[in-house]
Structures are given as C-alpha cells and as structure tokens.
C-alpha cells in the first residue's frame, strides 16, 4: 500500500544463549537418525530418546480395506459410466463430421 512503510527486521541479540555442547550433540545425533532412516518405528524410538518430550499421538492403523464385492460393484459402475461417456463422444464426433464437411 502506498501509505505504509515496510517493517524492519528484528535486531540480532548478541547476548543470546548458545546451547551447551552436550545438547547440541544430542540434537545432531537425533537429527541424523531422523533424516537418514525416516521410517515410523525408528522415529518413535528417536522421539523416545528425547528428554522431556512426550509422544503426542500414536501411529494410527491403516484404514480397513474394502470388501472385494464392493470393489467389483464399483468397477462395474465405473465401466458403465465410461461406456456412456464413450458413446457420447462417438456421437459428438459423428455429428461434427457431418456438419463440418469443409476439408
């Protein structure tokens, strides 16, 4: 907007406390494990090693799979829809060929 000025960045605090070396080493070790392996069981083990952190949520089980009969019904329904769309497209192509005889 024309009447507004951009905000300045926050000033850098030179007295900011640095992490003690043992905490930095532990964070580095945890980060290496997380980024190298990246699978759910390993992550839960790594998170369990972090002091003072509790696990917020458990891993959910995957959604239940469909019954094969439902899949067959859905497949048949999709085929019927595809057949109708295919028939409509063929009719449109035929009509466009009949009315657009300019070659």
Swiss-Prot record:
It is found in: Mitochondrion. It comes from the Eukaryota. Changing residue 27 to A: Loss of pro-apoptotic activity and of targeting to mitochondria. One of its GO terms (biological process) is apoptotic process. The keyword Repeat applies. One of its GO terms (cellular component) is mitochondrion. Residues 90-99 are annotated as: Required for mitochondrial location. A motif (BH3 2) lies at residues 78-86. The keyword Membrane does not apply. Changing residue 78 to A: Loss of pro-apoptotic activity and of targeting to mitochondria. Induction: Up-regulated after exposure to ionizing radiation and other genotoxic agents. Up-regulation is mediated by p53. Keywords: Apoptosis, Mitochondrion, Repeat. Belongs to the PMAIP1 family. The BH3 motif is essential for pro-apoptotic activity. This is Phorbol-12-myristate-13-acetate-induced protein 1. It comes from Mus musculus (Mouse).
